[in-house]
């Protein structure tokens, strides 16, 4: 039993990608964004399919994780939106806790 000589090896497609964190500088049409990476380079980022299908909003000023190909470092795919430190959601939860405390003290 001879093996084929021209047989392709299975490669992990994620090996050719580098992940960075960046800041969204500008929103462009069709789910495209200008993103400034940690090393101060500005690249064009597009939304990944999972983010698009789950309707996650990405706005200017958001911090994101972006995958950049080694072969074309001018474009990247936004794979994750990082949570804000001073998010409105955390403020809302603090407000509801304060309301619960005031109700408990009154009743």
From Swiss-Prot:
Residues 81-107 are annotated as: Disordered. Transmembrane segments: none annotated. PROSITE patterns: S1_IF1_TYPE. InterPro entries: NA-bd_OB-fold (IPR012340), RNA-binding_domain_S1_IF1 (IPR006196), S1_domain (IPR003029), TIF_IF1 (IPR004368). It is found in: Plastid, Chloroplast. Keywords: Chloroplast, Initiation factor, Plastid, Protein biosynthesis, RNA-binding, rRNA-binding. It comes from the Eukaryota. GO terms for cellular component: chloroplast; cytosol; plastid. Residues 8-83 form the S1-like domain. It holds the Pfam family eIF-1a. The keyword Protein biosynthesis applies. Disulfide bonds: none annotated. Residues 83-107 have a biased composition (Basic and acidic residues). GO terms for molecular function: ribosome binding; rRNA binding; translation initiation factor activity. The keyword rRNA-binding applies. SUPFAM superfamilies: Nucleic acid-binding proteins. One of the essential components for the initiation of protein synthesis. Stabilizes the binding of IF-2 and IF-3 on the 30S subunit to which N-formylmethionyl-tRNA(fMet) subsequently binds. Helps modulate mRNA selection, yielding the 30S pre-initiation complex (PIC). Upon addition of the 50S ribosomal subunit IF-1, IF-2 and IF-3 are released leaving the mature 70S translation initiation complex. Component of the 30S ribosomal translation pre-initiation complex which assembles on the 30S ribosome in the order IF-2 and IF-3, IF-1 and N-formylmethionyl-tRNA(fMet); mRNA recruitment can occur at any time during PIC assembly. Belongs to the IF-1 family. This is Translation initiation factor IF-1, chloroplastic.
């Amino acid at each position: 039993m001879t093996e084929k000589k021209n047989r392709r090896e299975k490669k992990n497609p994620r090996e050719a990608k580098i992940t960075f964190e960046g800041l969204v500088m500008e929103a462009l049409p069709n789910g495209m964004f200008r993103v400034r990476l940690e090393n101060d380079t500005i690249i064009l980022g597009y939304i990944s399919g999972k983010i698009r299908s789950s309707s996650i909003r990405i706005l200017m000023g958001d911090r994101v994780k972006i995958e950049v190909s080694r072969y074309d470092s001018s474009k990247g795919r936004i794979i994750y939106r990082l949570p804000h430190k001073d998010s409105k959601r955390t403020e809302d939860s603090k407000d509801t806790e304060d309301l619960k405390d005031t109700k408990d003290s009154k009743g």
